Amino acid sequence: MPQYSKIARGVSILALATGVLGLEGAALAQPVLEEIVVTARKREESLQEIPIAITAFSAEQLARAGYKNLQELSGSVPGLQYSALGLNIPGRVQSNIRFRGMDTNSLGPTFALGTLFVDGIFVLGNTESIPFDDVERVEVVKGPQAAYFGRNTFAGAINYIMKTPSLTDYTGEVKASAATYDEYNVSASVDGPLVADKVGIRMGGRLYSKGNMFTASDGGGLGEESSRSGQATLYAKPTDELSIRLRGFYARDEDGPAAAGYIPGRLNDTCTGKSITTKAGQTATPVRWICGQVPKQGTAINALGGFKIIDSNTTVRSPQAFLSTGDPDFLLKNLIQKPQNAALAGVPSIESIEMERTMYRLSGSFEYEWANGITAVAQGGFNKQQINWARDYTFTPRDNAYSRDPQDLEDYSLEARIASGQEQRFRWLGGVNFYNQDFVSSLTGGDSLFVCIDTVPGLPIGTCRPNPAPATTPNAVFIGNNAVASTDHVETLGVFAGLAYDITDEFTLNLE
């Protein structure tokens, strides 16, 4: 089970970027089964003594619970919400980490309130494809963490501590699992010394695949996912004082159309005629909304008046585009295979309604510890993620609107810090970090192809009027070409520090 932090008699004064006084009294009732050392505050501390709200899982606990990724883990951490669904975008495209229900109405990573770190290094973009096979410990920290983690941590942060290669023993491991919907998950790793007691290496790989969970009206599958990844860590300890760690990670995801759909409030209205009290104490009478429990598939009414909610077009051979243009490959030629904007030329090419993503991550750290316990650390990381994604914009079987939403993300970070020994009564830490990010995207709509502009009066909005007119009419219109409206560039320079003083054996003052 997870281990929770316990503050028996502690006070934490969080200054600088956080500025709050925090006591996590609720954790007092949580049982402690084993001693876990965490590094959420850039130094090794006992989970039972650290003065912040933190939940930690060891590798043994992750394996015992059968957690394979962050989505499965999130259900065991109060206040943490994570799923592949990012805002209103179905599928594993723009996944968001949420703490205590806080979120932003932004599709880009720049304004995220919760972020993932690997060995304390910021991870830009998708987190779902990082498996737990190579993770030694997961630390979930709730509440503002800008003092130590920097940007995008107003609500909290998650830190993966990766396994350290052995300098003495050779080990290997193979894991395999299978589930419904033709799902399988296979991973393997090897670990051992290259130079006895001096240099070790750990390498691993993973294959994951899941078949369709639903079948669309056109016969295509919905919910198909596949991932393959590989990682390698080189660890060197040339002297007792110095340790060096280099890590590389690569992953590729290929998903089909998402198993998702929309439930329109106007057709499933259970609010009209009811009055509700808002948080501000005002009385409201909502209309065309869903009140209470969300209706399930088979009960809810979809946008076409039927009862099949999980549905969409899965083929690039659009019948409506053929009626309008006479070209059965109009959608393929003018959207899926259309040349990218020059700023997005490196994203993966796609051939159908699908999502493809590639990720590269490199990181390195150097740590030196003197005889008096003072430790100096220098670390840096580089992330590169490129995505291309074509979807049925309406998520209904209506042959109407399609979009292609590519994005290119790249960042690097550098950090240096120095800390006193942790066994003394007065402890200190200080450091500086630099972060640079480039995010190029068209997630505000990207390339859009509308094959249905005209509608039939009296029928649901967007219902196509069959029209074999030539392409010069409004029924087949191509709009936009990667306007890259979501593009941004970020540079951040930060300085952080922390002081701790044991006033008594039972009472510690922390200033950050």
Give residue ranges: language-model regions.
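Transmembrane beta-barrel architecture of outer-membrane proteins
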Residues: E24, A65, Q94, A155, ...
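Secondary-structure transition into beta-strands, especially the periplasmic turns and strand N-termini
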Residues: L28-V32, V135, L167, D182-Y184, ...
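Acidic, small-polar-rich N-terminal luminal/periplasmic segments of exported/outer-membrane proteins
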Residues: L33-L167
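Structural signature of outer-membrane beta-barrel domains
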Residues: R43-E45, V123, A179-Y181, Y208-N212, ...
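Outer-membrane beta-barrel translocator/receptor signature
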Residues: A112, G125, D133-E136, K142, ...
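Periplasmic-side early beta-strands and strand-to-turn transitions of outer-membrane beta-barrels
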Residues: N159, T168, K175-S177, D191-Q293, ...
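Extracellular/periplasm-exposed beta-strand and loop segments of Gram-negative cell-envelope proteins
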Residues: S177-A179, F214-G223, A259-G265, T325-E356, ...
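A surface-exposed, glycine/aromatic-enriched loop/edge motif typical of exported proteins
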Residues: I244, G248-L331, Q437-N467
